[in-house]
Amino acid sequence: MPQAKNAPAASFDSLQTELDQKFAYPASSKTYIAGSRPDLRVPMRTIKQTATRTDQGEMLNPPIPVYDTSGPYSDPDVHIDLKAGLAPLRAKWIDERGDTVVLPSLSSEYGQARAHDPATAHLRFAQLTNPRRAKPGANVSQMHYARRGIITPEMEYVALRESLNLQALQDKPEYRKLLKQHPGFSYGANLPQRPEDITPEFVRQEIAAGRAIIPANINHVELEPMAIGRNFRVKINGNLGNSAVTSSLAEEVEKMVWSIRWGADTIMDLSTGKHIHETREWILRNSPVPIGTVPIYQALDKTGGVAEDLTWEMFRDTLIEQAEQGVDYFTIHAGVLLRYVPLTADRITGIVSRGGSIMAKWCLAHHKENFLYTHFDEICEIMKAYDVSFSLGDGLRPGCIADSNDAAQFGELYTLGELTKKAWEHDVQVMIEGPGHVPLQRVQANMDEELKHCFEAPFYTLGPLVTDIAPGYDHITSGIGAANIGWYGTAMLCYVTPKEHLGLPDKEDVREGIITYKIAAHAADLAKGWPGAQLRDNALSKARFEFRWEDQFNLGLDPEKARAFHDETLPAEGAKIAHFCSMCGPKFCSMKITQEVRDYAASLDANATAAEHGMEEKSIEFRKAGAKIYS
């Protein structure tokens, strides 16, 4: 898929043309780990390395497996038809459980109206099937199965995906050195110590305890299951969505594909413009990753934008509408209570959450308690009928570092803990949303408070941004906070782009934001000691020392940018096998000099004494040449 162009796709036909070209990763192949059944094949990406050249000949370097979020879009053997959607990967698994029914029609009044509206017929996804719902009295959540001791195909899928089958590589000599890593410090997390410890039973236990979720609506059958939890790899979320002034359906699908190409583990559709229902349908039918929404946005749209006119009945219908489309998790701001709203009065930035401000306005206008809070049990009944996970929203998150960790923020957090317990009584999966803007020295307190008051439910944070002085660079200010809070225990990081606070991001901004957050998440995995996390670092470091430039590019998170930066100063093809870069040049490359010393030592029997002798001779040569570092 061409990445140089920043212009959005004008139509589904033009986007289809791009997808037909595939967005092949350099030197990579799509590989699958086989599960316990023929229809359980877990994807990963394998990066091929070139050989190391030595005086004695070539030494082969092994391929490196990496976690892959791109779904079938990067599989050359799969034909993608956007108008038909992706293959129904989970349909058989769900059907086999025997606890759901296929509905004769949509349950939502709004959904039915959209399905029969001639004005939107040209926008409608044509290949729709009737939605599923739990049988009366049944609970179809992954937490419910886990608490009954059932290991679902989704749980097995997650175990294989998280381990990357690294246990099969441990006894191979070519991987032994590459698989070494520093011990991590996990702040009390229950991390698996070895790849073989990441079993389906381990996943089941984490889901049953509420420490992790598998967001997987029974109506999102195209989904490749993944886990969000403190004791798994740190995940990242990317946002997309139309607004009143921008975007077409094709553009939003393109943003989704673009985001997962660069590594987004989940996508939140934050659409607030026209055709929200149709946009979401197209995204879901073509998405291999979980999709989250903020249902209050669409409910508000149904009132014409008047928060005071929101009703529980309208919101309930919106939940059912979206659940029957297949949304995997809902952000619900049920912790914005009437008594907390006055606590924001002395803040510099007040209430910055859109959902939080909507509910605060409703509470004040009616002088009633938040209807999301008072109807929470009814919301849980809907969630467990479709296996939609809660993302309990932080509607009172701080919008600047001056407002961080105040009474409003933590008061809401404690209420979210209360609601977590209530959701778990229904066996509904929960994660907790967090800030926001927090200076570095106050970041860990956010994690500690969440773990204590929300009982280790997965934490999902927006950054946090650790300073407010860098408009245009908030992917960096937030990436710093994200790496730290990920290390402390946050399970998923919501990306921030360079356009944060300034405007709507384009494709390159999205790419920049995702790569920044992949760095933060990986740094956190290294710090907490996720098994095998250092493999890619070690492989790239070895390639760097051996001047295998193509491998350096290909093993990186953004091969295109790395290659482009290198070629700005050394564009010739020969430079990609040269034993220097433009930073030091051929005479002063530290790695080249070190290799020369090693080679010299090897010629003198390659023992420690010879290495020391080699250094002494180099010292004599250096002094004879005038002892000048620069000439």
Curated annotation (Swiss-Prot):
Cofactors, names only: [4Fe-4S] cluster
A molecular function (GO) term: zinc ion binding
GO BP term, example: thiamine diphosphate biosynthetic process
Cofactor binding, per record: Binds 1 [4Fe-4S] cluster per subunit. The cluster is coordinated with 3 cysteines and an exchangeable S-adenosyl-L-methionine.
Record's keyword annotation contains Electron transport: no
Residues the entry annotates as binding substrate: 239, 268, 297, 333, 353-355, 394-397, 433, 460
Listed PANTHER family: PHOSPHOMETHYLPYRIMIDINE SYNTHASE, CHLOROPLASTIC, THIAMINE BIOSYNTHESIS PROTEIN THIC
NCBIfam families xrefs: PRK09284.1 (NF006763), PRK13352.1 (NF009895), thiC (TIGR00190)
Protein name: Phosphomethylpyrimidine synthase
Species assigned in the record: Ralstonia nicotianae (strain ATCC BAA-1114 / GMI1000) (Ralstonia solanacearum)
Gene (name only): thiC
